[in-house]
Amino acid sequence: DAAGKPMDGVFIDRNGDGLVNEKDKYRFHKPAADVFYGFNTSLTYKNWDFAAAFRGSWGNYMYNNVDSNNGSLAGVLINPTYLSNAVENVLETGFTTNDIKRFESDYYIQDASFLRLDNVSIGYTFNQKPDSKSLVKLTLAAQNVFVVTKYAGLDPEIASGIDNNLYPRPITFTLGLNVNF
């Protein structure tokens, strides 16, 4: 519409032939990233050591099917208990029907570029003496610590390009004790 909001079941005549049909369909971005990257660091100071590993992608897009399924009034009003599953944009979009045409819209395709802190660890080695093989080391580590992304769905890192009610990746903490004699 004039305000830039999507309209339910309305599509653009992209090729200008006066008809909205199969010939107007197009590919709006892609799930594959343009760039994959990663970097890590490790630091040691006296008895302390620290390590971190980051990775990410840039230029990938995701179809947010979670928002698509819960983003129409028909989808959340059919049962009063579904109202709590509605997404923020259910009133913004004005989508009233829950038909297949929403899958043909590019409204739910979102930039899924991200930077993820995959692993971080900090360790302390107790009373290590020079020329001694014995040591006691305590380590605290975490995996999947945080993700920086504009993507509003569950996880920006889904190879298929469709975010469809997957179980989110957990943050995992590990406490380690290493004893050598």
PLM segments and residue spans:
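C-terminal region/CTD detector
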Residues: 37, 51-53, 60-62, 130, ...
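Extracytoplasmic gating/loop element in the C-terminal half of outer-membrane beta-barrel translocons
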Residues: 2-5, 57-142
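Membrane-embedded beta-strand positions of outer-membrane beta-barrel proteins
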Residues: 52, 138-140, 177
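Strand-connecting loop/turn motifs
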Residues: 45-48, 133-135, 170-172
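Outer-membrane beta-barrel pore domains and translocons
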Residues: 44, 55-57, 141-145, 180
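Surface-exposed loop/turn segments flanking beta-strands in extracellular/periplasmic regions
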Residues: 14-19, 71-86, 156-166
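Outer-membrane beta-barrel transmembrane strand signature
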Residues: 1-51, 95-112, 117-119, 123-127
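C-terminal beta-signal and terminal closure region of outer-membrane beta-barrel proteins
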Residues: 81, 91, 100-102, 147-181
